UniProtKB/Swiss-Prot annotation:
PANTHER family: PROBABLE GENERAL SECRETION PATHWAY PROTEIN D, SECRETIN GSPD-RELATED. GO terms for cellular component: host cell membrane; membrane. GO terms for biological process: protein secretion; viral extrusion. The chain crosses the membrane at residues 317-337. It comes from Enterobacteria phage fd. Residues 1-21 form the signal peptide. It comes from the Viruses. The keyword Transmembrane applies. It is found in: Host membrane. This is Virion export protein. Gene3D superfamilies: 3.30.1370.120, 3.55.50.30. Acts in the assembly and extrusion of the bacteriophage by forming a channel across the host outer membrane. This channel is just large enough to allow a newly synthesized phage particle to pass through. Extrusion is a process of concomitant assembly and secretion and takes place at specific assembly sites where host inner and outer membranes are in close contacts.
Length: 426
């Protein structure tokens, strides 16, 4: 009977110890699986930073529940990650310079602490008073406010803090002292504001030099101001005046100008871009070709003569426009504009492709709904064409009687019309 009682006691002790000891074996397992295991074992909520990636290898036959957190942090730090904060905790890149961490203690100092407080050779992790809280962002992207919120938190406390964004639900996750988090909603209300959108309408066109382009019915009585303060009644006078290449106009100059250009045989519309972008965000549009350019060639003794090779780099050649608008409180728009009109040259003087480039880059201040005229970029094209009677033009001496050569010079000027309109946030 005594022997049976002893056996039952030993069995119960084995079951009891097994229920508390944690056994884990992971070989090159994803780090997020290790985090999931820890969360299930402890019941703690854990937020994983987007830059936390990699694998872990862990073999442990006996991890007591009271040591799980320290064991988990030790594994994270061995892989250059760490867990900070609480309720919930945040896993991020390990920063040994943070005030939340201290250096690894020597063995003589570790003996002064309870052996159950940390695994042998591990770290002592002091508890801090940070609280983790989430904040819903309603009008802008949460990730755009990270630096602003970090500045607010760090300017109000010297303690460590962390700010992360959850892009899927547009949340900010902030780990900081509680008094800072209590004041954060009031600060967020001053930066989480609706953002206006700006509609950019453009017209890129060429006019042959010397041709009078009639914009009289297009511009009509639409008055404008040429840069420099000179008033004008018609867009025509700006284009035809000596050196006139930019001005600011009110009214529907852009739409009416498109009609005028379509009826003129000496003008050519290159592009009519339309871009809608948020205030403070870049928008761009382009159309053209992706042209290969030879950047290197290997032949002769340094390469296989039967299989020479060359390196090629592709670049976009065509019409493009990029804008960076900012809507001001008074109804003005500060606009960064870059417009390019590139083309392939027909010249055969070079061994590779030749491109003609014309570009405009500037920063202007417009009123809502105004139209800006930029331009004055002149392009010269000299072309020669040989023609003759087949066979007869190839006969020496007398062949000149049956052939001819014609030379032509073309000169065109590039203009860009840009209209900016604020689309108010609802």
């Amino acid at each position: 009977m005594k022997l049976l009682n002893v056996i039952n006691f030993v069995f119960l002790m084995f079951v009891s110890s097994s229920s508390f000891a944690q056994v884990i074996e992971m070989n090159n397992s994803p780090l997020r699986d290790f985090v999931t295991w820890y969360s299930k074992q402890t019941g703690e909520s854990v937020i994983v930073s987007p830059d936390v990636k990699g694998t872990v290898t862990v073999y442990s036959s006996d991890v007591k529940p009271e040591n799980l957190r320290n064991f988990f942090i030790s594994v994270l730090r061995a892989n250059n990650f760490d867990m900070v904060g609480s309720i919930p905790s945040i896993i991020q890149k390990y920063n040994p310079n943070s005030q939340d961490y201290i250096d690894e203690l020597p063995s003589s100092d570790i003996q002064e602490y309870d052996d159950n407080s940390a695994p042998s050779g591990g770290f002592f992790v002091p508890q801090n008073d940070n609280v983790t809280q989430t904040f819903k962002i309603n009008n802008v992207r949460a990730k755009d406010l990270i630096r602003v919120v970090e500045l607010f938190v760090k300017s109000n406390t010297s303690k460590s803090s962390n700010v992360l964004s959850v892009d899927g639900s547009n949340l900010l996750v902030v780990s900081a002292p509680k008094d800072i988090l209590d004041n954060l909603p009031q600060f967020l209300s001053t930066v989480d504001l609706p953002t206006d959108q700006i509609l950019i309408e453009g017209l890129i066109f060429e006019v042959q030099q010397g041709d009078a382009l009639d914009f009289s019915f297009a511009a009509g009585s639409q008055r404008g101001t040429v840069a420099g303060g000179v008033n004008t009644d018609r867009l025509t006078s700006v284009l035809s005046s000596a050196g006139g290449s930019f001005g600011i106009f009110n009214g529907d100059v852009l739409g009416l100008s498109v009609r005028a250009l379509k009826t003129n045989s000496h003008s050519k519309i290159l592009s009519v871009p339309r871009i809608l972008t948020l205030s403070g965000q870049k928008g761009s549009i382009s159309v053209g070709q992706n042209v290969p350019f030879i950047t290197g060639r290997v032949t002769g003794e340094s390469a296989n003569v039967n299989n020479p090779f060359q390196t090629v780099e592709r670049q976009n050649v065509g019409i493009s426009m990029s804008v960076f608008p900012v809507a001001m409180a008074g109804g003005n728009i500060v606009l960064d504009i870059t417009s390019k009109a590139d083309s392939l040259s027909s010249s055969t003087q070079a061994s590779d492709v030749i491109t003609n480039q014309r570009s405009i880059a500037t920063t202007v201040n417009l009123r809502d709904g105004q139209t800006l005229l930029l331009g004055g970029l002149t392009d010269y094209k000299n072309t020669s064409q040989d023609s003759g009677v087949p066979f007869l033009s190839k006969i020496p001496l007398i062949g000149l009687l049956f052939s001819s050569r014609s030379d032509s010079n073309e000169e065109s000027t590039l203009y860009v019309l840009v209209k900016a309109t604020i689309v108010r946030a609802l």
